[in-house]
Structures are given as structure tokens and as C-alpha cells.
């Protein structure tokens, strides 16, 4: 594990990064909660127990030993964005939902759900990659775009849904 500190607008955020099969992923902790997952995070700084646990869970997920993350998280954004994140968290490993199915759950349009998925600050852990278009993969705002979405779905055993 590697550790880093990111300073943004005079607010210090602890970052721990871990190498994975899809690249280096960095977890951001603020005030005892995970607030972001960053792609290709930089290393340096202090270590916290929460970040150590988060990196351990990410490693276990990619080793096929973890189906569901158990970390305190705080999602910035509107009540609607948080509702979409909650709906994504309810999608089990190896399964997918469409933007329309999530829209029915949260009482919004599929396009609004897609926009909220694109603003997901904690991808992989909040599994926006499990949300697909009705007739296509939809998008993915993480590093690598839709190709990364496919890699994550294959890792989870949901690749058969892509054919």
C-alpha cells in the first residue's frame, strides 16, 4: 500500500493507494469517511486505519474474496445523487441493472440517473459499472471509460450480460 496527502482549497485529505489489476486506485478519507476513489493517485503522507482497511478490501475484491464493501462513506452531492448511489449499492456482485430500472426505484428519468452515475465520487465501491443502458453498455466516467466498465463486469462474472 502507498499513502499520500492531497491538499485542495486548504483542506487536507488523506489518500491511500493500492495497485490493482485495473491500475492504481486511491481512496480519499475525510473526517472518518471515504469520500472519493481516484484513478492513478499519487503517493506520500500519513496512514489511517480506515484507509488501510479500505485498501485491504479493494485488494480482497480484486482477489475474488469480497462481494460487498463495508466502509463508512460520505457522498457529496444532492439528495438525488445520494439516492442513486444507494440504489447502486443495492446491486449485488455479478448482477446489473439498467438506468431505467434505477430510475423507477428513485422516481426519476433514466437520463437523470445516468448523469448521477457519472458524478459517482466512489466508483468501484459504489458500483456504477453495474448500471447499463437498455440496449448498450452506457457510459463510465472512470479512467479507461467503457473499456474499464467491461473489465470490472468481467471481473465480477457479469460479462455474459455483455454478449
Report the location of each language-model feature.
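Short Lys/Arg-enriched helix C-cap and helix-to-coil transition segments
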Residues: 125-133
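Basic nucleic-acid-binding alpha-helical/helix-turn surface characteristic of O6-alkylguanine DNA
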Residues: 2-108, 155-163
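Structural signal for hydrophobic
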Residues: 88, 128-129, 152
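Residue-level detection of the helix-turn-helix DNA-binding "recognition helix"
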Residues: 118
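…primarily DNA-binding HTH/wHTH and HhH modules…
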Residues: 135-163
